[in-house]
Amino acid sequence: MYEFWKELHNAPYHFPMDESIWYESMNYDVDSDGRELFTEIDTEDTGHAMVQYGYSAFGFDENGEISPEIHYPIIRDLAFAPAYRTEAEALLKKVLEYFKGEPRIYAFFHYFGMSACGRHGKLHDNDRHIAQLLERHGFVVEHENVYYMRQLKDTDTTDGRVTLQWRERTAGDCREFAAVLDGLEIGWGQVHFLPQGDIAYLRWIFIDSQRQHSGLGTAVMKQLCQELYHMGIRRFDTDTALSNTAAQGYYEKTGFVNAGITRSYYSK
């Protein structure tokens, strides 16, 4: 199924990976802190269409905190060539029957994407035929993000004003950092180091509000990109909400390329 999966997945976050990395990420994935993502997960295919679905191992309470008492029914992946919609629809109907009785079913839940794909769980706008099939069965858009990608090069330079202090790597291969200027922390972030070895994903970044619009945010990103390059990273991606135009401007100013819109869905 590995070769079949590669044929059907060509979004910017479907990075090259060998079969062992793919298998681990498909079946035994964890989040940034090493928590298993799913209590149960099944994958089915017809030879022309595939679906992966199951129950999450945890969810998020009303305060946004992780709760092991909450379990979401999730269609993690649905993929097919446009000519095989009938086969894909049969798979989708089977999944909907499996989740029958659930008040809400999620599809392409961002947090529960594959680690080998930066855990970007949303569906790319290029796969409009998949979105149309979901919509045909009562799914609506939950959230929209802009996806960004950046190639790191040895020509990425910094003026040396900002230094980064890295924390230990988590069980989920993430490292947080603090950006320091004149002995004071002025920014923070978290980077996910993907199992491929030369790809990293920026999970989040924040610059002290009193330091914004001073050029220091750009200096922090330049320092980050330079250090990641020297760690062996060549591809550095991230995303932000479609509504967050300030973050979009920041990423585009610091060399990231807009690679399209991605969406998550839920059933009404």
Spans of features found by a protein language model:
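Conserved catalytic-core motifs of GNAT/GCN5-like acyltransferases
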Residues: 123-151, 239, 257-268
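Short acidic/polar active-site loop segments enriched in Thr and Asp
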Residues: 101-103, 234, 257
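A structural microfeature
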Residues: 45-47, 143-144, 187, 260
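A conserved beta-strand-loop-helix scaffold within acyl/acetyltransferase catalytic domains
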Residues: 12-36, 48-66, 173-175, 180-181, ...
